[in-house]
Amino acid sequence: MLRWARACRVPRGLLGPSTTRCSAVPSVLSSSDSSGGGRVVGNPRPLPLSYKLLDGEATLPAIVFLHGLFGSKTNFNSIAKAMAQRTSRRVLTVDARNHGDSPHSPDTSYEAMSQDLQGLLAQLGLVPCVLVGHSMGGKTAMLLALQRPEVVERLVAVDISPADTTPVSHFRNYMAAMKSVDIPEKVPRSHARKLADEQLSSVIQDPTVRQFLLTNLVEVNGHFSWRVNLDTLAQHFDKIMNFPQRPESYSGPTLFLLGEKSRFVQWQDSEFDPEKALPCWPPVLQLLGIWALL
């Protein structure tokens, strides 16, 4: 059994040759400043996130991309390069805690992820910035905008809203399937990936979803493991699917990109009222009938 250590086009007006800076950190760290991954005692201790920064014009607000659950900064490789070339802005892609090359921690709260991002943005001098978050990353972006509106020049939330998405999520099944995968040691990577795909297919019929999850399969000294922190993500899944209730509001320019066939935001439902569902954001809300796939 394994251990686990259509593109959306953003309008040019919303955002504005580059070189690259990268940072990778050890894959296992812990934070003791939480109580069970949901409710946080005091300010959570920020972790040093892994990131990739494409250089650009320093006088323009940088574009920062935040991935969703089981994702990583590599999800945005193509769009990040395109945005850097098209807008001449700095573009930052980041691995969230418990994902990609960033450290692992038992604290999966959005407060903790917001603190991580605030620390990184200050470290890199990217305040204020245009914050673009998909799914889990969208909730992190929304929370940061509420906590520190001066940090977020503009906000883009992709296929997500500040609502509980647990009832429509299949992620629990995905995590159970990933945990059950069993790959022998010292097999070729291509064969290991094929074995994992075959085992996942009994639960996850969509090959696109399987290929996305398999981006997390890594080899360390002949042993294959999942780089996402499955134990912690599974334990605190409900907290990840929910959104912290906050009294603040964010008055900056905000764009919600909602997929027409999204399972996470049922905007086509007659009961969906943007002003009631999104009370903390400006009344101008753009709902696009697109597939929000990254």
Question: Could you say what each language-model-derived stretch is?
Answer:
Residues 1-64, 81-90, 126-127, 284, ...:
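Alpha/beta-hydrolase fold catalytic core
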Residues 36-60, 77-80, 84-136, 140, ...:
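Active-site loop/oxyanion-hole signature of alpha/beta-hydrolase fold enzymes
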Residues 60, 68-71, 135, 260:
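Active-site glycine-rich loops that stabilize anionic/oxyanionic intermediates
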Residues 69-81, 267-268:
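The serine-hydrolase catalytic nucleophile loop
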Residues 70, 96-100, 162, 286:
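Alpha/beta-hydrolase active-site loop signature
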Residues 142-192, 196:
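Flexible "cap/lid" loop of the alpha/beta hydrolase fold
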Residues 169, 186-246:
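Conserved alpha/beta-hydrolase catalytic His-Asp/Glu region
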Residues 218-281:
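Conserved serine/cysteine hydrolase catalytic core
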